UniProtKB/Swiss-Prot annotation:
Official protein name in the record: D-tagatose-1,6-bisphosphate aldolase subunit KbaZ
Family: Belongs to the GatZ/KbaZ family. KbaZ subfamily.
UniProt subunit comment: Forms a complex with KbaY.
GO CC field: plasma membrane
Pathways involved: Carbohydrate metabolism; D-tagatose 6-phosphate degradation; D-glyceraldehyde 3-phosphate and glycerone phosphate from D-tagatose 6-phosphate: step 2/2
Job of this protein: Component of the tagatose-1,6-bisphosphate aldolase KbaYZ that is required for full activity and stability of the Y subunit. Could have a chaperone-like function for the proper and stable folding of KbaY. When expressed alone, KbaZ does not show any aldolase activity.
Pfam families listed in its UniProt record: GatZ_KbaZ-like
GO biological process entries: carbohydrate metabolic process; D-tagatose 6-phosphate catabolic process; phosphoenolpyruvate-dependent sugar phosphotransferase system
Top-level taxonomy: Bacteria, Pseudomonadati, Pseudomonadota, Gammaproteobacteria, Enterobacterales
TM ranges: none
InterPro entries: Aldolase_TIM (IPR013785), GatZ/KbaZ-like (IPR012062), GatZ_KbaZ_carbometab (IPR050303), TagBP_ald_KbaZ (IPR023435)
UniProt source species: Escherichia coli (strain SE11)
Record gene name: kbaZ
Length: 426
């Protein structure tokens, strides 16, 4: 499992390559990603966050072992080699337990790390930046680093115990905004300063030394920083290389380290490529992929309304809206404004809070109904042109089958293609 270390080595040697991390648990997104990586013969990095997947099940209901089983089963069904699959754990630390005293939260974090490592996750993001119930706000670099070193020790011991060798690759640090897109409307974003990045690295190096973990420093492959990219509900802050140039140059002094950029969703292809060139060589993407899934489903629902009598339609859009109104916990604190503004946000926001609702049984039934309705007879080409114009071109050229499932998968892959191109290197 040396794909990441090798990628970093090549990048540091001047190749300007990178890797993207697919941060989603949706089966169609994962199928799209696995098929795309297979077609391009590249390794695939899939990550779960501490919110999605933990030892108690997370919001997906999956433990790390469950998630690995789910992904590996999907990979096997698509003939994707498991040795080309890299699993990562994102924001692993006390994130889920900030309402508990630090001692209790960190005990849970120890178990979280054990469960991820024992399940075979090899890329481990240690993030102890969040304050717990009895902590000062914000935490000092030293406290954050001490807690990360504690978790690294647990990770190393667990890896040796289960696999007989310590081959984990680590990411440290955190971006300033909360994971998964900003809550509030954005106008400008502070880029991590070189001094702050150096302070984080030195605090971690010192804390790792105190834990007797000097030997693993070359396996700390990336530092999470804020290069000045983010999105909120309707806006994207685009990467501005000039603002990040000092930060970009700073990492050139570390021979085994690159940067990891979170919230790169919705950046232009040019910005994604420039991020990789500027050493932000691990690009995280999640909401943009489920946003593309949602776009394709809304387009297919519009096609269905043109072709199928109203009483036989799936009503996917309305079912989705009804379930989100009935169970508002995943969007209520994120979407603001009057009723119409919130309605638009539920359907179309870049932050894509709708992604939390796809596993709901009513919505899943409506999705299956939609696919059945459109699979019965060929979708007329003019309707594909109207509602899925990018896919229409590929259908007409004969490279894409115009079935509902293939249209959805291909629309998601259009986003993956931007990341692949950005990461390919020279």
């Amino acid at each position: 499992m040396k794909h990441l270390t090798e990628m970093v080595r090549q990048h540091k040697a001047g190749k300007t390559n990178g890797i993207y991390a697919v941060c989603s648990a949706h089966p169609l997104v994962l199928e799209a990603a696995i098929r795309y990586a297979s077609a391009n013969q590249t390794p695939l990095l899939i990550e779960a966050t501490s919110n999605q997947v933990d030892q108690f099940g997370g919001y997906t209901g999956m433990t790390p072992a469950d998630f690995r089983g789910f992904v590996c089963q999907l990979a096997d069904s698509l003939n994707f080699p498991q040795d080309a699959l890299i699993l990562g754990g994102d924001h692993l630390g006390p994130n889920r337990w900030q309402n508990l005293p630090a001692a209790q939260a960190m005990a849970n974090a120890d178990d979280l790390i054990k469960s991820y490592v024992a399940a075979g996750f090899k890329k481990i993001h240690l993030d102890c930046s969040m304050s717990c119930q009895d902590d000062p706000i914000p935490l000092t670099d030293d406290i954050v680093a001490e807690r990360a070193a504690r978790l690294a020790k647990v990770a190393e011991e667990t890896c040796l115990e289960h696999f007989g060798e310590a081959d984990l690759e680590y990411v440290i640090g955190t971006e300033v905004p909360v994971p998964g897109g900003a809550h509030e409307t954005l106008s400008e974003l502070a880029v991590t300063t070189p001094d702050a990045a150096r302070a984080t690295l030195e605090a971690h190096r010192h804390a790792f030394e105190k834990q007797g973990l000097n030997a693993i420093w070359p396996r700390i492959i990336a530092l999470v920083v804020q290069p000045g990219v983010e999105f909120d509900h309707t806006n994207v802050i685009d990467y501005q290389p000039a603002k990040a140039s000092a930060l970009s140059q700073m990492v050139e002094n570390y021979e085994t380290l690159i940067f990891e950029a979170h919230s790169t969703d919705y950046q232009t292809p040019q910005s994604l490529r420039q991020l990789v060139i500027d050493h932000f060589a691990i690009l995280k993407v999640g909401p943009a992929l489920t946003f593309a899934l949602r776009e394709a489903l809304f387009s297919l629902a519009a096609i269905e309304e043109e072709l199928v009598p109203a009483k036989a339609c799936s009503g996917l859009r309305q079912v989705l809206e009804d379930v989100m109104l009935d169970r508002p916990e995943y969007w209520q604190s994120h979407y603001h404004g009057d009723g119409n503004a919130r309605r638009l946000a539920r359907g179309y926001s870049y932050s894509d809070r709708v992604r939390y609702y796809w596993p709901d049984s009513q919505i899943d039934d409506a999705f299956a109904h939609l696919v059945r309705n459109l699979a019965d007879s060929p979708i007329p080409l003019p309707l594909i042109s109207q509602y899925l114009p990018l896919q229409y071109v590929k259908v007409r050229s004969g490279e894409l089958q115009p079935t509902p499932r293939e249209l959805i998968i291909n629309h998601i892959q259009d986003i993956l293609a931007q990341y692949y191109t950005a990461c390919e290197g020279q």
